[in-house]
Amino acid sequence: MKLKLSTVTIKLKLPIAALLLGAGLTACTSQPDSNIVEDNMEFAQQQLRCAFDEIDYAVANESPESRAQREKNGWGPLTNPRNTEPDGTLHLVPSKDWTSGFFPGELWFLYEYTQNNFWKKKAQQHTDILEQEKMNGGTHDMGFKMYCSFGNGYRLTQDERYKEILLQSARTLSTRFKPKAGIIRSWDHNKDKWQCPVIIDNMMNLELLFWATKESKDSTYYNIAVSHARTTMKNHFRADYSCYHVIDYDTITGQVLKKNTHQGLAHESAWARGQAWALYGYTMCYRETKLPEFLEQAKKVEQYLFTHKNMPEDLIPYWDFDAPGIPNEPRDASAATVIASALYELSQYDRKNSERYKKNADRIVENLTNSYRTTLNKDNGFLLLHSTGTKLTNVEVDVPIVYADYYFIEALLRKDKLEKTGKLF
């Protein structure tokens, strides 16, 4: 019988090769920059192999109560990892969960890096179980779920079936567009609180729509994405270029009703991952449109982040930039990975600040590697510790979370490609 591995919080800093050689070695305090991508990708391969065993164990040992609740809600079978629970157990989610596409995306990244068909087959397996989500019109998270999984798969294989699934996903997402307000509706829940909420996270789902226009030649998707990005730029941001988490719209008049948070400290605070989504989202929008307004927005968000008095020296943000207990507040490694990945891309578009953007991205990657990495063959196969989902409700606080790992690997691949070829796209 397989023994369940508990979460271990000791962080080893040795390269993989040294870990495998055994005793008698002295721990390194930093990773040589030339080896940091290779080391982390070797580590990721080992950890994700470990994750397959953890997934099998979690599925086999799901409690009757959990199974009954899942079936009652019509959530379908458990598919992919989301996070480690406080007791060290692995939390798996069904395809309906907004995080279900990140794990298969990681597998596609490993296939891209290694060209090993083992990772391709595993990626196909964990991607295909999400296909039914292409028709799920009850969520804005089609980009997270479908583009991170099927999108990476199509990019690497040109599988026509994946293309059709992605186009249907884009059609489904476009049904949530509200023309009067000019935005894509986010949540359908909390209808007693919001009429038509839009969260900053939704910027990340626009890449699917841009892709759909390029593949289908139908400009509808492009126009929806640009409208959403422009409206978000107008209404989500404060004068200092920090952003709100939730903006509530009147779908008849298009007027803003409320400016709130749901996962940050307070309505007027700067939730760290929200700022990261904004930086990444507008950088990506500039890539897809070449509209200068989006590049300027990304640059302003970056400036806000890296001149903030509460940005830590290691550049791994606290969960909210206005959290009252800083420096004794939980960090959010997931925000750091999103920021790093975005900075590598942003460095391609702003020659004046390119060196600074890349240097800060490199610092984030180095600090995550040396101080935030999990323990080899443990921690349920996750890569990074110390992410924070929703601090105020004590959900996913200071634990490994799958999207931190996804954007960490993406950042590593971008760093590798940038340093080898000088360009990303």
What are these model-predicted stretches?
Residues 2-16:
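Bacterial N-terminal signal peptides that target proteins for export
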Residues 15-23:
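Sec-dependent N-terminal signal peptides
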Residues 26-27:
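C-terminal motif of bacterial Sec signal peptides marking the signal peptidase cleavage site
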Residues 31-425:
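Glycan-recognition and catalytic cores of secretory/periplasmic carbohydrate-active enzymes
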